[in-house]
């Protein structure tokens, strides 16, 4: 009886949690994933691109556009775009 009850509890809890998480996951993961993923991609691209082909031109242009202008508007736009979060 005890074993059966324990097995039934996690199954039901997991099922409920999964369903609830899925609903919130869509909205919750949407904002952070976009912001974090985009930020990481930009930073990585900047460092990676800055060394190989583009040395000075891309660095000045990309850095200014991606770092200064990107950090501000991206954060503001992300918040405005995701009013649910």
UniProtKB/Swiss-Prot annotation:
Q: In what tissue types does this protein appear?
A: Expressed predominantly within leaves and cotyledons vasculatures. Mainly observed in fully expanded leaves, at the base of mature inflorescences, in senescing leaves and cauline leaves, and, to a lower extent, in hypocotyls and rosette leaves prior to flowering.
Q: Return the Polar residues bias intervals.
A: 58-77
Q: What are the start and end residues of every segment in region (Disordered)?
A: 1-35, 55-85
GO aspect biological process, one term: response to wounding
Which portions of the chain have biased composition (kind: Basic and acidic residues)? 1-24
**Result of knocking out the encoding gene:** Reduced accumulation of starch content.
Q: What induces it?
A: Accumulates upon light induced oxidative stress and after hydrogen peroxide H(2)O(2) treatment. Induced by drought. Negatively influenced by QQS. Reduced levels in response to cytokinin (CK) and methyl jasmonate (MeJA), but increased levels in response to ethylene (ET).
Annotated function: Plays a role in carbon allocation, including during senescence and stresses, thus impacting starch accumulation.
Q: What is this protein called?
A: Senescence-associated and QQS-related protein
Annotated source species: Arabidopsis thaliana
Taxonomy of the source species: Eukaryota, Viridiplantae, Streptophyta, Embryophyta, Tracheophyta
Gene symbol here is SAQR
């Amino acid at each position: 009886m005890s074993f059966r009850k324990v097995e039934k509890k996690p199954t039901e809890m997991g099922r409920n949690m999964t369903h609830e998480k899925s609903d919130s996951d869509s909205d919750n993961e949407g904002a952070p994933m976009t912001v974090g993923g985009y930020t990481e991609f930009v930073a990585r691209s900047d460092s990676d691109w800055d060394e190989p082909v583009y040395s000075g031109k891309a660095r000045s242009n990309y850095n200014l556009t991606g770092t200064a202008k990107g950090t501000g508007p991206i954060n503001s736009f992300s918040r405005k775009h995701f009013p649910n979060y």
